[in-house]
Design a protein with these regions (language model features):
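Cleft-lining beta-strand/loop regions that shape enzyme active-site pockets
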Residues: 1-86
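Beta-strand segments within the central parallel beta-sheet cores of soluble alpha/beta enzyme folds
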Residues: 13-14, 46, 146-149, 190-191
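Short glycine/threonine-rich loop-to-helix capping motif typified by GTGT followed
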Residues: 22-27, 159-162, 202-206
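Conserved beta-strand termini and adjacent loop/short-helix elements that scaffold enzyme active sites
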Residues: 44, 97-99, 191-195
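C-terminal intrinsically disordered, low-complexity extensions immediately downstream
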Residues: 174-206
Length: 215
């Protein structure tokens, strides 16, 4: 919506996230890449912009961070829960029927075999390579340069400026002013996206609502 609205001349993306799902990060990165071809995008980092939070920041036209922002964490990990020992300890016997051996690879009721472990590791490494390549492209660095400061390392905002992951130290107001300069406008007003049609009580949730979490 912000990309196609001709009245919007520049976008400031406020990021306050320690990371998240790899696919979601890639989808947001792609939207930023498409939008950047039409209008400038400036990132303003809050307390966190790490892992997936940095993934979606790396291709912006300019990146601002606070001195103590936690950023970087260019790395990938996967979690495969296994309940084998738990069910054995509780005396629960689980029988599975599947079409072939590979169909049960993601089962939480069987140990992780070496073949599937190697397959999973290969997938994680591919995602990491994509992550590093995105950062290298967005920050005008080589793969080796990004990998040297990547591998899951976290950096403060001030350190991130020194190593090239962030452009400037500054807050949201600084990012807004810079975006206005890029768009070559002096008088402007801001609009928040997405716009939520909920009140404060709805955001807090009712007593009956259950907590939902994701990675």
């Amino acid at each position: 919506e912000a990309r196609t609205d001709e009245n919007i001349k520049a976008i400031v993306l406020r990021i306050d996230s320690p990371g998240g799902n790899a696919l979601t990060s890639e989808l947001i990165w792609r939207e930023i890449e498409l939008t950047k071809k039409i209008k400038p995008i400036v990132v303003s980092m809050g307390n966190y912009a790490a892992s997936g939070g940095y993934y979606i920041a790396c291709n912006a036209n300019k990146i601002f961070a606070e001195e103590n922002t936690i950023t970087g964490s260019i790395g990938v990990f996967g979690i495969l829960p296994n309940f084998t020992q738990l069910t054995t300890k509780m005396g629960i016997n689980v029988e599975q029927v599947n079409t072939n051996k590979n169909a049960a690879d993601y089962s939480v009721f069987r140990p992780l075999d070496e073949n599937f472990r190697a397959f999973t590791l290969e997938g994680v490494e591919k995602i990491y390579n994509t992550f590093v390549n995105h950062v290298a492209s967005g920050r005008k660095m080589t793969y080796a340069q990004v990998d040297a400061i990547g591998q899951g390392r976290v950096w403060s905002g001030s350190d991130a400026v020194k190593i090239g992951l962030v452009d400037k130290i500054g807050g949201l107001d600084d990012a807004l002013k810079y975006a206005a300069d890029l768009a070559k406008i002096k008088d402007y007003k801001t609009q928040n996206f997405p716009e939520y049609n909920k009140n404060f009580k709805d955001l807090l949730g009712s007593k009956e609502r259950k907590l939902k979490t994701n990675f």
